[in-house]
Amino acid sequence: MTNESEVGVKKAAELLRQGATMLEEACPICKMPLFKLKNGDVVCPVHGKVYIVKSDDEEKIVKRNLQLDEIESILIDGLYLSAKKMKEDPLDSERIVQIIRYLDALERLRKIKINSSE
């Protein structure tokens, strides 16, 4: 048994102890069984959260949503760092403009997410 599969088996056992349900589907990457957590998430013991899609269109939607979430996270991190730096010099006009751009980008991104879910 390889080291990766040993770790996967140990994580799978831990998931079962925590009340997860083993599913008949397998991870498309490592072929380990998938588990459904109590909160409804489907996870691979090796790779973490897995999204099960039934069609190519559904796969595109999931990928797009994941990318939008990642972009949103990056924007929020940048906004946080800019706001933190602004405490050092509250009158820095370039920093203020940068914060406004982050807020504008976040607003646009959220509108895209709302429109794409309709």
From Swiss-Prot:
InterPro entries, per database record: SSSCA1 (IPR009563), UPF0148 (IPR022954)
Domain of life: Archaea
HAMAP family documented for this protein: UPF0148
Family: Belongs to the UPF0148 family.
Protein name per the record: UPF0148 protein M1627_1409
Higher taxonomy: Archaea, Thermoproteota, Thermoprotei, Sulfolobales, Sulfolobaceae
